[in-house]
Swiss-Prot record:
This is Large ribosomal subunit protein bL25. The keyword Ribosomal protein applies. CDD domains: Ribosomal_L25_TL5_CTC. Keywords: Ribonucleoprotein, Ribosomal protein, RNA-binding, rRNA-binding. Residues 186-201 have a biased composition (Low complexity). Gene3D superfamilies: Ribosomal protein L25, beta domain (2.170.120.20), Ribosomal Protein L25, Chain P (2.40.240.10).
Length: 208
């Protein structure tokens, strides 16, 4: 994904305000052993790009003065109540160094999963993205999660995912194989089953 940017020589609160008033957004690109570079981008183009999932999880080609640098979107600041991007941070990437990036999960075959189609269960997404480690060339835009064989009451874990070549998932918090999604019994059916069980227990209870 290509991003056209322009070098900027001034910085500070006043300069940034004037830049935004002219329809531009201040930004910085840093990392990969090179000096940080102050840049500016067209605000409207940036605002719409931020709505795209791929903009957050892809290697971006940032063109400045005819030269292209590969980078990741690392941070951005939005105005509290205006549709305004205040600042953006990009991090350069090296083709030979692994990067850590959060990648979205795309869930497939939810409607045809046995637990939904036959058991009338409810799909619960426990994770919506995962942090991966890989070389920039191997970075996927998303990872597919196939729920096509999941039965009611079953859970899909990180270890069950099919990962692209060269990609590993980083886990945190001590759980090496966290849950990704499951199919649960609807709350109404749980209550009905509990009532039926209680009624059956009452019928089986001997008279006093």
């Amino acid at each position: 994904m290509k991003v056209v940017a322009f070098e900027r020589s001034v910085q500070g609160t006043g300069a940034s305000r004037r830049l935004r008033n002219s329809g531009k957004t201040p930004a910085i690109i840093y990392g990969a052993g090179a000096e940080p570079k102050l840049i500016e981008l067209d605000h409207n183009a940036l605002y719409h790009a931020l709505k795209k999932e791929a903009f957050h999880s892809s290697i971006l080609d940032i063109e400045v003065a005819g030269k292209v640098e590969k980078a990741l979107l690392r941070d951005f600041q939005l105005h509290p109540f205006k549709q305004l991007v205040l600042h953006v941070d990009f991090q350069r990437v090296s083709a030979k160094e692994k990067i850590h990036v959060k990648v979205p999960l795309h869930f497939l075959n939810q409607e045809t999963a046995p637990g939904v189609k036959l058991g009338h269960g409810i799909v619960n997404h426990i994770l919506n993205d995962v942090e991966v480690s890989c070389l920039p060339a191997d970075l996927p835009e998303f990872i597919e999660v196939d729920l096509g064989t999941l039965e009611i009451g079953q859970t899909l874990h990180i270890a069950d995912l099919k990962l692209p070549k060269g990609v590993t998932i980083l886990t945190h918090g001590g759980d090496e194989n966290p849950a990704v999604a499951n199919i649960s019994v609807p709350a109404g059916e749980k209550s009905a089953a509990a009532e039926e069980g209680a009624a059956a227990a009452g019928e089986d209870k001997p008279a006093a």
